[in-house]
């Protein structure tokens, strides 16, 4: 997939959640979220928004090894291009924090209203049926 990417984020192993939380922090701070979708379809948004405070760009850069400006660029690209989809492979889930990775990806999709619409959502890519 890398040859087709406009931006390739080379993060440290195990830093997926921090990267996604940092992207969501940017989206909230810059008002790129889908407020109507959140109001109609999401619960506990205020608590979620509060949890993002721990993921400022400097902290995310330190945790992930990804330059802050790349995190911001990824967040803006994802939020500004509708519909957006998240595709992931088995490596995303095959770790002690795999469930947290999927939850964070789903939260990113919901934050931007990129779920339940054609060409959107959170989509695992597997080599066999029902692998996920």
Q: What positions do the PLM features span?
A:
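Cofactor-pocket helix-loop regions in the catalytic cores of large enzyme subunits
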Residues: 1-130
């Amino acid at each position: 997939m890398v040859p087709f990417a406009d931006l390739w984020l080379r993060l440290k192993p195990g830093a997926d959640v921090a990267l996604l939380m940092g992207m969501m922090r940017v989206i909230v701070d810059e008002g790129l979220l889908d407020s109507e979708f959140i109001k109609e379809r999401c619960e506990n948004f205020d608590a979620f928004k509060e949890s993002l405070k721990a993921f400022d760009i400097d902290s995310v850069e330190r945790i992930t090894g990804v330059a802050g400006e790349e995190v911001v660029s990824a967040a803006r690209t994802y939020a500004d291009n509708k519909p957006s989809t998240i595709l992931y492979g088995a490596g995303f889930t095959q770790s002690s924090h795999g469930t947290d990775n999927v939850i964070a990806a789903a939260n990113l999709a919901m934050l931007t209203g990129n779920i339940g619409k054609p060409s959107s959502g959170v989509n695992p890519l597997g080599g066999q049926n029902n692998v996920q």
